[in-house]
A protein has these predicted regions:
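C-terminal motif of bacterial Sec signal peptides marking the signal peptidase cleavage site
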Residues: 17-20
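C-terminal beta-strand-rich structural cap/linker in extracellular carbohydrate-active enzymes
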Residues: 535-581
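Carbohydrate-binding surface patches
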Residues: 444-517
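Well-ordered alpha-helical scaffold segments within catalytic/enzyme domains
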Residues: 45, 121-138, 183-201, 239-242, ...
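Active-site lining segments of carbohydrate-active enzymes
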Residues: 193-265, 273, 277-280, 296, ...
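Extended ligand-binding clefts on enzyme/binding-domain cores
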Residues: 213-230, 281-293, 297-445
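Solvent-exposed loop and edge beta-strand segments that line ligand/cofactor-binding
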Residues: 93-122, 164-184, 233-247, 278-291, ...
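Low-complexity, Ser/Thr/Pro/Gly-enriched N-terminal "stalk/linker" regions
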Residues: 23-169, 198-227
Length: 582
């Protein structure tokens, strides 16, 4: 009896040891084939290393923007840039407004009872500030997160976030008549709510939005070919504004986030229905900002929900500049007047090219986390963002020569944290033709009496924290360390720190990566292998020329497992595309 027991015990120890060794970092089976990088065609036309190269301190810019714009004590012409709205629309509380542009005569505390202010500026600035470490729920005695609930239009029966608190305040920009404004502000609100889920009343607003979006999605089915949707009557409509089929990606984002938050499959089904409607389009319907969210949701649903969406289709529609409902809308590629401007987002045709600050900042929100779920696009996204981040400094009046901007003599009021609305190749402003690139804005055209200073875009500049919270420089010029988790909102599961680094140089580079004080094993999801182990402090990582790495900081000595095409460390997914032939 004793001999049999001893034999059994030894056998169990051997088996246990075998299983253990199969799950440690030394012996996990390699993938049957390593994923290959896929080039986004539009990105291949961009320089590997943009010139002249000057990387703006995006985090400092975002912090300084918040300190300037959210300062009620600022004095001088057109200041302060913020005020309190005491009209208590939709909720019995005060809210606040920030100017759309410096000096906007349509807005302010003494115009229309202080009600004229846009959600797109307030919500974007909260997300941006939060990404660089500022708590907007408790700042100088104000809870700005709670205050933006007033944009939830329940008084008119729509029960979604809208660009204004009510029809009385509609001064331009969309309000019930321009689809992207109504949908994107809900994407932004869900972004705010991701960071502040416990602020009073936020959850109930989120749930109401999700239910309205789901009802609307069922009403629309596979047809989003409308200019707007009346959420009070659940009726779509058309007007002089082009149809905007890409809003379906905005629906998908909100509904998938609601699915993760509330764990109710009806929202997942709604998200899938919306994304399939967009994927089924026969031509590029990229209108404003939703198509990159389509790429992000496609990658996530493929990785997390067994989908089979065409990620490249959404990426091409985002980048190629061949939209049919907004002619030429996409990513600009080129060198204007000796400046590489590739990567900025806007019209590839208007004025020879017109890239916008807000759109460019916001593009990083979905595209960076997308590579977590589909690392085949790591190199392309790294290259695009290097170009975009370099070119975007030219939106700022102190980062572009005076001769290449509309208002060099009036730039002091910007403190170089408020950018021009955009950058054009061929300006048509009197006295400035032939200058390229040229920083300007459309503010003076919005209404009679607008001062020149309305070229400086407060609403767009508030989104700069998306760059500030995701981009950091390294000890090698041109190699950025890009945070792929910062804007990966409503994650289904826990995740380890994940960074994308792209080497734009023609030779191999060794870059220093800060790891922190806890021991980690470095996994590269591009090569699909561990490249260093048991590290703390700083580590040197080699990157081949014109290649990228996607680094995951895995706790040292984690137990590994590979199943269902996923590689996990201590149960946390570190690779969504790890395929092993068994």
């Amino acid at each position: 009896m004793k001999n049999n027991f001893s034999f059994t015990a030894v056998l169990l120890l051997i088996i246990t040891g075998f299983v253990s060794c199969r799950t440690n970092t030394e012996s996990i089976l390699p993938p049957s084939s390593v994923v290959s990088q896929i080039d986004i065609p539009r990105v291949t036309g961009m320089p590997d290393m943009p010139r002249p190269y000057v990387m703006k301190d995006w985090k400092k810019t975002a912090v300084d923007f918040d300190h300037y714009v959210y300062d009620f004590s600022q004095k001088g012409p057109f200041l302060p840039l913020i005020w309190i709205d005491t009209m208590k629309r939709n909720f019995l509380q005060n809210t606040y407004g920030i100017y759309t542009a410096i000096g906007d005569v349509r807005e302010g505390p003494h115009v229309n009872d202080g009600e004229n202010h846009e959600a797109i500026g307030a919500l974007g600035s909260i997300i941006g500030a939060t990404l660089v470490g500022i708590d907007k729920s408790e700042q100088d005695g104000n809870n700005y997160v709670a205050m933006v609930k007033n944009y939830f239009n329940k008084d008119n029966g729509w029960n979604i976030i809208m660009n204004f608190t009510g029809k009385k305040a509609h001064i331009g920009g969309g309000y019930g008549n321009d689809y992207w404004y109504d949908i994107y502000n809900n994407v932004l609100f869900y972004g705010v709510s991701h960071f502040y889920p416990n602020v009073e009343g936020i959850d109930s607003v989120q749930r109401a939005i999700a239910d309205q979006f789901l009802a609307s999605a069922h009403k629309l089915g596979s047809n989003y070919s409308y200019s707007f949707f009346d959420f009070s009557t659940m009726t779509p409509g058309k007007n002089h504004i082009p149809t905007q089929e890409d809003v379906a990606a905005g629906y998908a984002f909100v509904l998938y986030a609601a699915y993760i938050k509330y764990k109710d499959d009806k929202y997942l089904k709604g998200a899938e229905m919306a994304l399939k409607a967009l994927e089924a389009q026969k031509e590029n319907r990229n209108y404003e900002l939703f198509m990159p969210f389509g790429a992000y949701l496609a990658a996530r649903l493929n990785a997390e929900a067994g989908g089979n969406y065409d990620v490249m289709k959404f990426l091409n529609w985002t980048f190629e500049g061949k939209s049919v409902n907004r002619d030429g809308w996409g990513i600009i590629v080129g060198n204007w007047g000796g400046y590489d401007v590739s990567g900025i987002y806007g019209s590839t045709k208007d004025k020879g090219g017109y890239g916008f600050a807000m759109n460019t900042f916001d593009l990083a929100w979905p595209l960076l986390p997308m590579v977590r779920y589909d690392q085949r696009y790591a190199r392309s996204i790294g290259k695009w963002l290097l170009n975009a981040a370099n070119a975007s400094r030219l939106f700022y009046p102190y980062d572009i020569p005076d001769s290449l901007q509309a208002l060099p003599g009036k730039k002091a009021i910007t403190k170089n944290v408020i950018a021009y609305e955009g950058l054009v190749k061929e300006p048509d402003l009197k006295g400035h033709t032939g200058k390229s690139p040229f920083a300007q804005g459309d503010g003076p055209l919005w209404a009679p009496g607008m001062p020149d200073e309305t070229m400086f875009s407060v609403y767009g500049s508030g989104h700069v924290g998306i760059f500030g919270g995701t981009i950091r420089t390294t000890d090698v010029e041109g190699i950025l360390m890009l945070d792929c988790l910062a804007t990966d909102m409503y994650r289904k599961e826990n995740a380890f720190p994940t960074y994308l680094l792209y080497n734009p140089h023609k030779d191999k580079k060794s870059v220093t990566v800060p790891l922190g004080s806890s021991s980690v094993d470095l996994y590269d999801a591009v090569s699909q292998k561990f490249i260093s182990k048991n590290l703390t402090g700083n580590s040197s990582v080699e990157i081949a020329p014109n290649q990228a790495v996607l680094l995951i900081f895995v706790p040292a000595k984690s137990k590994l497992s590979a199943e269902n095409n996923q590689l996990k460390a201590n149960g946390t997914i570190i690779d969504f595309n790890y395929k092993i032939n068994k």
